[in-house]
Regions:
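Extended catalytic cores of very large enzyme megasubunits
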Residues: 1-695
């Protein structure tokens, strides 16, 4: 066994009744001595290195040519002067295994962590040497982390896109379906995750050109997509990933769910495609009242009304659809369907759930479109309009699909840095550069939306880590107080920066005029309420940090009314599971799954203690499976008030829970205004062992 693996494993060998957390730092040092230093290509100086990387097609040239060599050198000097050290073996291993640039045979390392940060900073700086240094400082302090596609690809010659995720509307014709599959493969090849709204597609047994029973339904399309994503990956570096969403009132809903049953036939089962169900309030109402529900055949709805089922306000239209004899429908028991979804989620983790009316009550751009579906991780929630792809030689009618480039603030390091304003504004600028430099020609509706909407998705990580290291329990009132203040402040500074960019460029996103931002409605909660700390503990945490007052929110509203916003969407909290290891941060805003994670790589086991874990804060690092999920819902609901898009909300379940227990959590989440529920993870309590006594 390699020395760094041995040292890492010694964490678990108790000494004086305690885990040896200090062994992880020794493992990092050994990893650098035995692997990183031995396998890093040596260059005499920076110029030789950059010349080699450009001449051998590792780095793009244009972004570097925008600077003088002295400016480039200053950025690299900034990152190396920070004397950054990985605090855990897992963080170092994750970076050098997954993110560092390597030679074409992948045997030698061409970038250290400082080099990757410098490269990203120069890319974001767009020729402004001083701004590039600011980006470098922000990222080497680990206050901001670009999402994996951006961090992996920025500045590289042979790369995928830097945008993290894409959402495609699918219209109801073979042209549209085949084009959606083609675009999905192109986007997957570029490193993005792709979700598709299948709610417009005819259900199984509907008519084609008045021939009854001719259609095959959504499952056949899902099978094609499943194979497409497995085939199209990013040069073997990143697997293709896709998701399909369906409205719960679509007649194929049961067949759709059956694709994830463990016992499903191979002709039906989708192996890698994720699935999500869009749930309007009306369905929840029918289930609560134990009334029968009707699901509808979407083509008959379109023929009767000229509007697609998923674009209707089901709450307003449901009774009319039920009573219209021209609309084909089928009676179901909504409670049984909720139970079926609960069983599936305990078995497979799917489906995701999007509470459509919770989303659209808060959505600021309903005048463009209601939100009809979400993305692969259920945090991107935007307006979209469907395209119509015609035969060759005829013009296509290009709508608005969705793209969102993501990045995350490391809460602990932002708080330590003392300026939420500085971190947020620079993060918004970095995300904006990626948005503006992205033009995906193979996906015309994505490219159009990116040009017009300029959507970004700033998120966060390390919430549980920060709380635990400051002696605050995740389920406590103080934790919710902290989250309320922090995310209200982040929201404020994203709006300020978007407003500043609108003033600097003289440009707003397409459709700003009809939005809740333009009317001022969006801002009302902030000057009607006070989002400053309410508990002594949280007041102390924010002691030296500027928090906006209700009066400052009113001033911001007036500035936005006068000059507009540059971005249609600003905030989205992704799960950021992989990249959080590089940051030595707890993932997203969710509680931890384990105090000490065990990972297997090849024939070796490695251990990852949570950031800053010690005997003193052990019990503040309470594991998610031991938490009251209703309190976790309360936390996410608190944060959701301040996030214009969504939060990737993972449910943590024990195998002793019943479907009734899960349905109670779902209904409580819906009641609290949660927008989406992501993957459901179930823990096998039969294998449970208690580590608490070994602290």
């Amino acid at each position: 066994m390699k020395r760094h693996i041995e040292l890492n494993n010694e964490i678990m060998i108790k000494k004086d009744g305690r885990f040896q957390f200090e062994k992880d730092e020794e493992a990092v040092r050994a990893y650098f001595i035995d692997y990183v230093n031995q396998n890093t290509v040596f260059f005499h100086d920076l110029k030789e290195k950059l010349d080699y990387l450009r001449d051998n097609d590792y780095y793009e040239t244009d972004f570097l040519d925008a600077y003088t060599f002295e400016e480039i050198k200053a950025v690299y000097k900034t990152t190396y002067a920070a004397k950054f050290r990985f605090p855990s073996f897992m963080s170092a291993f994750k970076f050098y295994n997954d993110y560092a640039l390597k030679t074409n045979d992948r045997k030698k390392i061409l970038e250290r962590y400082e080099d990757r940060i410098a490269c990203c900073a120069l890319y974001f700086g767009k020729g402004d040497g001083a701004k590039a240094i600011e980006f470098a400082k922000l990222m080497i302090r680990q206050e901001y982390q670009p999402a994996t596609p951006t961090f992996l690809n920025a500045g590289r010659k042979r790369r995928g896109e830097m945008v993290s995720c894409f959402l495609l509307e699918v219209n109801d014709s073979l042209n549209d379906i085949s084009r959606a599959i083609d675009i999905s493969m192109q986007l997957s090849k570029s490193g993005g995750g792709v979700s598709l709204n299948l709610s417009k597609i005819r259900a199984k047994g509907e008519s084609i050109k008045d021939v009854a029973g001719a259609t095959k339904g959504v499952v056949g399309v899902m099978k094609l997509l499943d194979n497409a994503f497995r085939y199209a990956d990013q040069m073997g570096q990143r697997q293709g990933a896709g998701a399909a969403y369906l409205n719960v009132f679509h007649a194929d809903i049961n067949d759709f769910l059956d694709t994830k049953k463990i016992s499903a036939d191979e002709d039906v089962r989708v192996k890698t495609l994720s699935i999500g169900v869009v749930v309007p309030d009306k369905f929840i109402e029918l289930a609560r009242e134990d009334r029968p529900a009707y699901v509808f055949y979407p083509h008959t709805v379109y023929k009767a009304y000229g509007t697609h089922l998923d674009e209707m306000d089901i709450g307003a239209m449901y009774d009319e659809l039920v009573n219209n004899p021209a609309v084909r429908k089928e009676r179901i028991n909504p409670r049984q369907l909720l139970e079926k979804m609960a069983v599936l989620r305990s078995e497979s983790g799917y489906p995701y759930m999007m509470f459509q009316d919770n989303v659209n009550r808060e959505h600021a751009l309903n005048h463009i479109s209601r939100v009809k579906f979400s993305n692969l991780c259920s945090e991107v929630l935007q307006a979209s309009t469907v395209s119509e792809y015609t035969d060759y030689g005829e013009p296509d009618d290009i709508g608005l699909d969705i793209s969102c480039n993501l990045g995350s603030l490391n809460i602990a390091n932002v708080m330590a840095g003392g300026s939420i304003e500085n971190a947020v504004k620079l993060a918004v600028d970095a995300l904006t550069v990626v948005s503006e430099s992205t033009n995906i020609k193979n996906a015309p509706a994505v490219a159009k939306a990116n040009r017009e909407m300029r959507s970004i998705g700033l998120g966060a990580m390390n919430l549980h880590g920060y709380l635990a290291q400051n002696g605050v329990a995740y389920e406590s009132e103080e934790a919710r107080d902290f989250a309320n203040v922090f995310f209200a402040t982040v929201n404020y500074w994203t709006l300020v920066r978007s407003n500043e960019l609108a003033q600097e460029t003289g440009s707003t996103f397409e459709g700003y005029e009809g939005s809740k931002y333009a009317s001022g409605e969006y801002f009302e909660i902030y000057f009607e309420g006070d989002y400053r700390p309410k508990t002594d503990k949280v007041r102390a945490l924010f002691k030296d940090i500027v928090i906006p007052t209700p009066l400052e929110w009113e001033v911001l509203r007036d500035n936005v009314n006068m000059h507009g916003l540059y971005h249609a969407y600003r905030l989205a909290i992704a799960p950021n599971g992989s990249i959080s290891y590089v940051q030595s941060a707890t993932a997203s805003v969710m509680p931890i799954m384990e105090r000490i994670e065990e990972r297997t790589y090849g024939n070796s086991k490695t251990y990852y203690p949570m950031p800053g874990l010690s005997p003193q804060n052990w019990f503040f690092y309470k594991e998610a499976y031991d938490m009251d999920m209703f309190k976790v819902v309360d936390m996410i609901a608190t944060i959701q008030q301040h996030v214009d898009q969504g939060i990737s909300f993972t449910l943590f379940l024990k195998d002793t829970m019943t479907t009734r227990d899960l349905n109670r959590i779902d209904l409580y989440a819906h009641h609290k205004g949660i927008k989406t529920l992501y993957y459901a993870r179930t823990k096998d309590t039969g294998q449970e062992g208690c580590l608490s006594c070994a602290v």
